[in-house]
């Protein structure tokens, strides 16, 4: 596959405690690495994919560096303990962007995701900017053409921008247009939105598209009455769920390593309360973690937070 590369073994290294007990294992010891892109030949039902791209962030006038996110997050995951669920993970490599050719990278990711999904592998994608979401989401739509797919975005931003070209600010507008083209419903929920970070034009577009929104303040002050009903609605109404997590939904004190750190944000402990029921309900088909930018990390703090989130998702995923 063009733009695809196998993950170097050097990224999956860690402390070996196996002399203590046979089950004293870490992720670097249980993950399987694909040497070529052939998901139908690989074990496990969680396909880990990287999308090494921040061209969308550059186009959106953000701080670049997220292209190095997948490699850094793999290193952070490698030394974490391997428990129930983690032995289902197979590293299916990374899609990279060639220069400024985001559209080609989107197509490659879309095809890779659809190929994994069609052979029974759910996809866990490490970005990359939030442009990741168009390629990932489109691949899920392609794999399940006759089904209702609910898109849940944990994010400070709506990412419904009007623009002349694709960027990290346009993925859900692109997915809306893709749903229009496929004559299917666009079912989008955004949780953690900062009103201060989205113009009225974006709120108007969200209203036009009937986007379900839970603001960051509502997450913090009305979790049981605003967040839980939205999660229950998505689980009840849709055949498949696609969860995309923009790490800038976290407070800057927990996640400094993003293009646009959040002054308020939703704490990691609260985010996990949202993620757990989505992982355990049996309908979650795809997850990505995006916008991690190692250039702005502080003592590996952001990498550890993002890796814990990915680790927990794989552990809970049913």
Curated annotation (Swiss-Prot):
SUPFAM superfamilies: Arginase/deacetylase. CDD domains: Formimidoylglutamase. It is an enzyme of class 3 (hydrolase). It holds the Pfam family Arginase. Binds 2 manganese ions per subunit. Its cofactor is Mn(2+). One of its GO terms (molecular function) is formimidoylglutamase activity. Its EC number is 3.5.3.8. GO terms for biological process: L-histidine catabolic process to glutamate and formamide; L-histidine catabolic process to glutamate and formate; putrescine biosynthetic process from arginine, via agmatine. It catalyses: N-formimidoyl-L-glutamate + H2O = formamide + L-glutamate. Pathway: Amino-acid degradation; L-histidine degradation into L-glutamate; L-glutamate from N-formimidoyl-L-glutamate (hydrolase route): step 1/1. Mn(2+) 2 binds at residues 155, 157, 246, 248. InterPro entries: HutG (IPR005923), Ureohydrolase (IPR006035), Ureohydrolase_dom_sf (IPR023696), Ureohydrolase_Mn_BS (IPR020855). Keywords: Histidine metabolism, Hydrolase, Manganese, Metal-binding. Mn(2+) 1 binds at residues 130, 155, 159, 246. Catalyzes the conversion of N-formimidoyl-L-glutamate to L-glutamate and formamide. Belongs to the arginase family. HAMAP family: Formimidoylglutam. This is Formimidoylglutamase. It comes from Klebsiella pneumoniae subsp. pneumoniae (strain ATCC 700721 / MGH 78578).
């Amino acid at each position: 596959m063009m733009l695809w590369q196998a993950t170097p073994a050097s990224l999956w290294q860690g402390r070996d405690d196996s002399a203590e007990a046979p089950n004293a294992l870490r992720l670097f010891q249980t993950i399987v690495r694909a040497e070529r892109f052939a998901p139908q030949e690989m074990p496990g039902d969680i396909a880990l994919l990287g999308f090494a791209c921040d061209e969308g962030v550059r186009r959106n006038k953000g701080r670049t560096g997220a292209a190095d996110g997948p490699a850094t997050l793999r290193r952070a995951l490698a030394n974490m303990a391997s428990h129930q669920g983690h032995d289902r993970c197979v590293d299916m490599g990374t899609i990279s962007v060639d220069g400024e050719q985001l559209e080609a990278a989107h197509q490659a990711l879309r095809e890779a995701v659809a190929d994994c999904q069609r052979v029974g592998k759910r996809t866990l994608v490490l970005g990359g900017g939030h442009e990741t979401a168009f390629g990932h989401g489109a691949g899920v739509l392609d794999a399940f053409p006759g089904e209702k797919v609910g898109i849940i975005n944990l994010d400070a931003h709506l990412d419904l921008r009007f623009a002349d070209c694709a960027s990290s600010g346009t993925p859900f507008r692109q997915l809306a247009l893709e749903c229009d083209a496929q004559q299917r419903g666009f079912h989008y929920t955004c949780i953690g939105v900062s009103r201060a970070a989205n113009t009225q034009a974006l709120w108007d577009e969200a209203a036009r598209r009937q986007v379900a929104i839970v603001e960051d303040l509502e997450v913090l002050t009305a979790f049981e009455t605003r967040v839980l009903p939205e999660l229950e609605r998505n689980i009840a109404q849709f055949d498949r769920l696609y969860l995309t997590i923009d790490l800038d939904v976290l407070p800057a004190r927990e996640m400094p390593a993003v293009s646009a750190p959040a002054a308020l944000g939703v704490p990691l402990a609260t985010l996990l309360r949202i993620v757990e029921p989505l992982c355990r309900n049996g309908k979650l088909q795809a997850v990505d973690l995006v916008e991690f930018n190692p250039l702005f990390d502080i003592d590996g703090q952001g990498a550890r937070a993002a890796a814990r989130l990915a680790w927990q998702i794989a552990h809970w995923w049913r």
